[in-house]
C-alpha cells in the first residue's frame, strides 16, 4: 500500500534567469512566465492589467519602501491567487512565515480582496534585488515592501484553480 500525503507548496525565491525551471509547479505558470520574460516593463505605468482574464493579472507597483513595523502590520496571505513578485528597481525586504504556524488572524478572510491578515510576526526576512523574484503560495504569509527608497516591481496574480 502507498501512503498518500498532500504537500503544501512553499515560497520560492530565485533569479529571473531561472524562472522557467518552475513552469511545472502550476498549470498557469507557463503563461505568467511568458508574460514576465517577453514584456518590456520599462516605462510601463503603475496599474493593473488582465493577462488571461481573472486567471492571470499583472500589477505594476512603484512606491517608497516602508519601515518593517508598517509592513508587518499588514502581514498577509491569499486564498485565491498565488503572487509572483519580480523586483525591477530598489531593494525590497520581505517578511515571511508559514500560514500553518500563524495563530493570530486579524479579522476574517476578505474574499473580495483575497486577503487575510495576521497579527503574528514573520519568522524570516529576505531581500529581493533587481532581477530576482519571489513566488508566494496561499500558505505563505508575507510582509512586502520593506525598505528605503523607491521600489518598482511586478506582482503577477495567478489564480490557484
Language-model features: locations:
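A short beta-loop-beta micro-motif enriched in histidine and acidic residues
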Residues: 71-82, 101-105, 121-122
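Short, Lys/Arg-enriched N-terminal segments with co-localized hydrophobic residues
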Residues: 1-10
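A short glycine-rich, His/Asp/Glu-containing loop-to-beta-strand
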Residues: 48-68, 76, 80-88, 96
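Short beta-strand His + acidic residue motifs that chelate non-heme Fe in jelly-roll/DSBH
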Residues: 94-95, 124-126, 141-148
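Long, hydrophobic N-terminal alpha-helical segment
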Residues: 11-52
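Short, conserved beta-strand element in jelly-roll/cupin
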Residues: 80-92, 98, 108-114, 157-158
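A short hydrophobic beta-strand segment most commonly corresponding to one strand
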Residues: 135, 150-161
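Conserved metal-binding segment of the jelly-roll/cupin
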Residues: 127-141
Amino acid at each position: 500500500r502507498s501512503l498518500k500525503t498532500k504537500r503544501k507548496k512553499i515560497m520560492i525565491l530565485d533569479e529571473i534567469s531561472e524562472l522557467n525551471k518552475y513552469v511545472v509547479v502550476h498549470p498557469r505558470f507557463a503563461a505568467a512566465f511568458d508574460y514576465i520574460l517577453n514584456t518590456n516593463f520599462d516605462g510601463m505605468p503603475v496599474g493593473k492589467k488582465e493577462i488571461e482574464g481573472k486567471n492571470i493579472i499583472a500589477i505594476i507597483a512603484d512606491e517608497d519602501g516602508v519601515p518593517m513595523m508598517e509592513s508587518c502590520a499588514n502581514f498577509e496571505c491569499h486564498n485565491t491567487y498565488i503572487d509572483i513578485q519580480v523586483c525591477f528597481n530598489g531593494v525590497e525586504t520581505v517578511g515571511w512565515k508559514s500560514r500553518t504556524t500563524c495563530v493570530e488572524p486579524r479579522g476574517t478572510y476578505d474574499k473580495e480582496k483575497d486577503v487575510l491578515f495576521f497579527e503574528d510576526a514573520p519568522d524570516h526576512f529576505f531581500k529581493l534585488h533587481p532581477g530576482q523574484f519571489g513566488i508566494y503560495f496561499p500558505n505563505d504569509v508575507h510582509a512586502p515592501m520593506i525598505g528605503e527608497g523607491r521600489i518598482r516591481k511586478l506582482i503577477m496574480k495567478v489564480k490557484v484553480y
